[in-house]
Regions:
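Anionic-ligand binding patches
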Residues: 2-5, 11-194
Length: 194
């Protein structure tokens, strides 16, 4: 089985990608290659963060790899939290604090349209390839479901049966999610190379 490095230490992301690619690739995380660095994510857009992480791994560890960045963009908040989604509530806060901040900022707001966007950067040799996925939805007024991670319990995709990502099985979520779509494009590209 072919090995590929995914530039993340996020166990939830690794699990999702292993579910999506595990029958074709052995997905290695940063810890698997001995990288325990806190890779900077200082760009203003998710695409550039993904590129920076892939380039960092290549420059410091020598591996071809792919990396991703995801942002939740809420229309009523002018695209916030966007590139800052993982750290929206500030340093040292977790996903629950991020959700609380979103819900507080949207209190009394009727327009709750939003989208998740994922950008995946694949660095092979000196060639960078980008793959993107997006899903439209709504931010609910309270949490629903216990699965998933991040903002999954308050995001209801337009596609589907009215469930939040946190209420869906991993297979349901991956079939319509932003990350699932970006990964599908990555897989198509990788398969065409073989």
């Amino acid at each position: 089985m072919k090995k590929i490095v995914f530039a993340t230490n996020n166990a939830h992301k690794l699990q999702e990608l292993r579910q999506m690619l595990g029958d074709r690739y052995e997905i290695l995380g940063l810890a698997d290659i001995g990288c325990h660095d806190d890779i900077p994510e200082t760009a203003d857009v998710i695409e550039d963060n993904a590129r920076m992480k892939a380039q960092y791994v290549k420059d410091h560890f020598g591996y071809d790899c792919f990396s991703d960045d995801t942002g939740l963009e809420i229309d009523a908040l002018n695209g916030e939290p966007g590139v800052h989604s993982a750290r929206y509530a500030g340093p040292g806060h977790d996903s629950e604090a991020n959700i609380d901040k979103v819900l507080k900022k949207l209190d009394g707001v009727n327009d709750r349209t939003a989208r998740f966007r994922t950008a995946i950067a694949l660095l092979q040799g000196d060639e960078m390839h980008m793959f993107e996925g997006q899903v439209e939805g709504m931010i609910l007024t309270e949490r629903h479901g216990t699965g998933g991670f991040g903002y999954d319990s308050i995001f209801q995709p337009v596609e589907g049966d009215g469930s939040t990502f946190a209420q869906m099985s991993p297979e349901q979520k991956n079939s319509i999610s932003h990350r699932g779509r970006a990964v599908a494009r990555l897989v198509e590209f990788l398969n065409n190379q073989q």
